[in-house]
């Protein structure tokens, strides 16, 4: 018997997803299609009768706007929202802004897959001469981060290492209080939570593709452990196509 329910949603397609570019900590907004994805995700939650007590998101507008769109659809815009850099997307370092297919053609699909999907291999760091270095590293939303906390690049392992303390210290206590929690975040910060919840191996998390804009539902026991695998709110065809699209992102164009 489930003691709690948790809903995760990956932000809708961003303008840089649309251009197939590595976004990372660059603050790309939703594309028009991404806004529609978020709207459909919200409508799926509304149709299923979901209500929430508290929401968590990153400090990046594609996740925040997805959350706003969902809350609008379910008519719960008044809910408290906690924003944290710890739920940000993985920092793609020197790859930030590069087209994924062009990068695959240059470095090989295998190398790009390692950078995108490996557990502990970071991409090349973002150097001070990178075109988006000041845009990210000097942004005042990160002014309170220590030098150790502000990354120049991250592996998935690094992303999980900064997301999990927030999960354990801030989100889990809310779940255990019986609060109905909604998390709107990013592919890699959410994969970190999923890996932790399901006890997935490093190899399994490498192959996990989370679709954009589709609510992911977990039923949890009293210890905040899943009693069954994640469920997607949406028709099977929509979910399958979305997951395939995510998997195809790092492949060179034929």
Curated annotation (Swiss-Prot):
Homodimer. Keywords: Acetylation, Glycolysis, Hydrolase, Isomerase, Phosphoprotein. The record marks 186 as: Transition state stabilizer. Substrate binds at residues 10-17, 23-24, 62, 89-92, 100, 116-117, 187-188. Belongs to the phosphoglycerate mutase family. BPG-dependent PGAM subfamily. The modification N6-succinyllysine is found at residue 251. InterPro entries: His_Pase_superF_clade-1, His_PPase_superfam, PG/BPGM_mutase_AS, Phosphogly_mut1. Its EC number is 5.4.2.11, 5.4.2.4. One of its GO terms (molecular function) is bisphosphoglycerate mutase activity. The keyword Electron transport does not apply. Catalyzes the interconversion of 2-phosphoglycerate and 3-phosphoglyceratea crucial step in glycolysis, by using 2,3-bisphosphoglycerate. Also catalyzes the interconversion of (2R)-2,3-bisphosphoglycerate and (2R)-3-phospho-glyceroyl phosphate. Acetylated at Lys-253, Lys-253 and Lys-254 under high glucose condition. Acetylation increases catalytic activity. Under glucose restriction SIRT1 levels dramatically increase and it deacetylates the enzyme. It catalyses: (2R)-2-phosphoglycerate = (2R)-3-phosphoglycerate; (2R)-3-phospho-glyceroyl phosphate = (2R)-2,3-bisphosphoglycerate + H(+). The modification N6-acetyllysine is found at residues 106, 251, 253-254. It comes from Pongo abelii. GO terms for biological process: glycolytic process. Pfam families: His_Phos_1. This is Phosphoglycerate mutase 1. The active site is at residues 11, 89. The modification Phosphotyrosine is found at residue 26. The modification Phosphoserine is found at residues 14, 23, 31, 118. It is an enzyme of class 5 (isomerase).
């Amino acid at each position: 018997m489930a003691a709690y329910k948790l809903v995760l949603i990956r932000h809708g397609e961003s303008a840089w997803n649309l251009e197939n570019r590595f976004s990372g900590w660059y603050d790309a907004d939703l594309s028009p299609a991404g806004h529609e994805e978020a709207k459909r995700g919200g409508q799926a939650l509304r149709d299923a009768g979901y209500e929430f007590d508290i929401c968590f998101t990153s400090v990046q507008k594609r996740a925040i706007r997805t959350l706003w769109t969902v809350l609008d659809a379910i008519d719960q815009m008044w809910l408290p929202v906690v924003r944290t850099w710890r739920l940000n997307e993985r920092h793609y370092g020197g790859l930030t802004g590069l087209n994924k297919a062009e990068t695959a053609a240059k470095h090989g699909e295998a190398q790009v897959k390692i950078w995108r999907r490996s557990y502990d291999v970071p991409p090349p760091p973002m150097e001070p001469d990178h075109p988006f270095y000041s845009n990210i590293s000097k942004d005042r939303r990160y002014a309170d981060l220590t030098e150790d906390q502000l990354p120049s690049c991250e592996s998935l392992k690094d992303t999980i290492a900064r997301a999990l303390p927030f999960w354990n210290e801030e989100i889990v206590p809310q779940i255990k209080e019986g609060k109905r929690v909604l998390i709107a975040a990013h592919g890699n910060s959410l994969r970190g939570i999923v890996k932790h919840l399901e006890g997935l191996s490093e190899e399994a998390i490498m192959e996990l593709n989370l679709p954009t804009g589709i609510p992911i539902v977990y039923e949890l026991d009293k210890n905040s452990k899943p009693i069954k695998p994640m469920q997607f709110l949406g028709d099977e065809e929509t979910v399958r196509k979305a997951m395939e699209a995510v998997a195809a992102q790092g492949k060179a164009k034929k």
